[in-house]
Amino acid sequence: MNARLLILVYVTGLTAGASAKDDASLEGVVQLPPPTVERALNQRYGTSVEAPLTPSNPPAAVVYLEGASTTNAKPKSGDIAQMAQKNMLFAPDLIAVQTGGAVEFPNQDETYHNVFSYSKAKRFDLGRYRKDEKAGRVVFDKSGVVTVHCEIHDRMRGTVLVLETPYFQKTDSAGHYRLDHLPAGHFTVKAWINEADVREHVVDLKSGARSQLDFPGK
């Protein structure tokens, strides 16, 4: 269906002494696709693992702000995201980091995993490791979409969305998001669901204002 852009602006008063520079906020709902259900048999290295008929990770989107003034902030020192291997899935299977951010890939299963990616934005291979071994860590120094796989269990698939902007948030399972402490100005806001489904709108953010922006389904 045709996307409708709904922007409701609520002007709020600034507290005394508060800076208006990064005092805008944006919230809304992304209409998400239905969850997927998978069943697979993996047989490698002399082992056979059958995945039960259960839902994968619930659908989610990453909502982020693009524009000239969104690339100034750097990742916070020590911030490390995690994408675990659990129940033969990447959990969560979608995360976002700012360029220069790090991600750990802990193994929480009772079997070997081997996390790797051949994506242009980041190529890596962490090798085989078990639950009781140190989790591999990767620094993502180039923006782009990084698709993550397990070399042993080929049904496993995850995505690391590496962004230049520090202004992003992953939605909850119902599609809700909220971005706070945003700069005022003219920006493009994108909702990334997968490489085939990226929705975007243009928004003018005002200092001290709260705006609502929804992303209906296609």
Language model regions located:
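Bacterial N-terminal signal peptides
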Residues: 6-15
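Positively charged n-region of N-terminal signal peptides that target proteins for export
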Residues: 1-5
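Extracytoplasmic copper-binding redox domains, predominantly the cupredoxin/blue-copper superfamily
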Residues: 20-218
